[in-house]
Amino acid sequence: MDLSIETDRMPFEGETCDGKNLLINPGGKGANQAVASSRIGAHTLIIGSIGNDAFGEDILHSLTDSGVHCDEVISTDNASTGLAIVIRTSGNNRIIIEHGANYILPSEQVIEALDRVACPGDVFLTQFECCEKTTCDAIIHAKELGLYVIVNPSPVHTIPKHVFNSIDLLCLNETECMSLFGLRAMDDFKSIDRSLSQLLANEAQTIILTVGDAGSIVVTRGQSLYQQAFRVDTVDTTSAGDTYVGAMAACVANGKSLNDAAVLASKAAALATRKIGAQRSIPTLSEIERFFEKGERDD
């Protein structure tokens, strides 16, 4: 669950600032990405854990209302539902998370769920809001089942070398790129392109780097594509990254090329910044088409 508050500027250490426009909304990276995937049009099922509390109930309702199948979500009395504190300022944000029930989700639970519901050729998407062992075990098992594995290493997390071999698509932002590979996204895209291409020799099959309003770059073995960001009137960037990743997963699942997927994911992420809040801001496919193809552009 996201508790989000707006302020004129980020407080300094030890400083208290006035805030306004408090929002309490369903969120969480996995949940946001699942909602984005479903709203883009992919059959989406989420595996996860929530606390047996009011926040957990709210999250389940939000997921099901968005068409996400939640049969593999467990409820526990041993931890509270995961929580994020979001501070918003003029289109930017900082986020602190408390993992809660996400962190006690055992590997066995995820592996058994994958065995029940996954089929070869399906897309498996994960990030690191669950514990490392569970996440890494799930990545490896998903690949063994013949799934296309997409990993978003967020919160920033080192990925063990042996796990990289099971990743088809690594989708990361500039902070994650710097932490994992020591590459500064503010360098020119040609330098980043060369560096990411070198990483592909030993890492994932495809790497996508998102750089906010500077766009994104899709690097595969043999080619790369720069995708510009779409300009809109930005209000809140909280769910932009999750929307991009979820939309990318949906597009891949629906058979789109990575190039076409990057275009649609960029549009979805841009549109998600026009509203305040996490899941409430994630657009549907029809909203994206109407906004970008029928003249409802901000510019």
Please place each PLM-identified region on the residue numbering.
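A glycine-rich helix N-cap at a beta->alpha junction
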Residues: S62-N78
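Conserved phosphate-binding/catalytic loop of the ribokinase/pfkB sugar-kinase fold
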Residues: S75-T76, V86-V123
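Conserved beta-alpha-beta core of the PfkB/ribokinase-like small-molecule kinase fold
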Residues: I111, G121-R194, A214-S216
